[in-house]
Amino acid sequence: MKHTAFLLLLVLLLGITSCKKEYIYRYGVDDLTATNNSAQKGKLKTPEQYIAILHINLYNIPMSSNDMYRLGQVYQSIGDKEVAQEQILSNFMNDDNPDSYAHQKGYVVVKPTNAQMRSNIEDFITDTYNRFYLRYPTQAELEWWRQYLNAHTNVTPEMVFFSFAISNEYQYY
């Protein structure tokens, strides 16, 4: 009888303590879309890739193979990679100069006006990062650009595009 009472008490205690409600913990964490960052860019663009990608980023249209060949020859003939890129970029951005490539082809750089940029700096910077770097800006980058553009009212969209196109990150894919 003692054993039966003891076993009954033991089973009862185990039954009571083992049947606990399982709690589901939920935390207020927002979903976040993961995107590539610049740390994964490790391959240097060839001169032809740089020119072709720059052309598409500025005009939203691909470059003809003849123009690609000619500009590739110009790029190679200059010798200094950075000087060559700055010269080609200046020529592309100078769409109102009659001697420029853009003017001769009838191309216009697709960019917002200064007023449009100033009216929504955050969207402008996000769009520019997506356009040139194929990624979203970090919060620190976004804040830096916001403060910089608010403090320097003489900076235009052309200047921002120029700085993105000659940056080290833009050299890689």
What are the roles of these predicted feature ranges?
Residues 1-2, 20:
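N-terminal hydrophobic targeting signals that begin at the initiator methionine
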Residues 2-9:
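Sec-dependent signal peptide recognition
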Residues 9-12, 71:
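Short N-terminal leader segment in a subset of presequences, especially plant chloroplast
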Residues 14-18:
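C-terminal motif of bacterial Sec signal peptides marking the signal peptidase cleavage site
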Residues 19-173:
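Composition-driven recognition of low-complexity segments enriched
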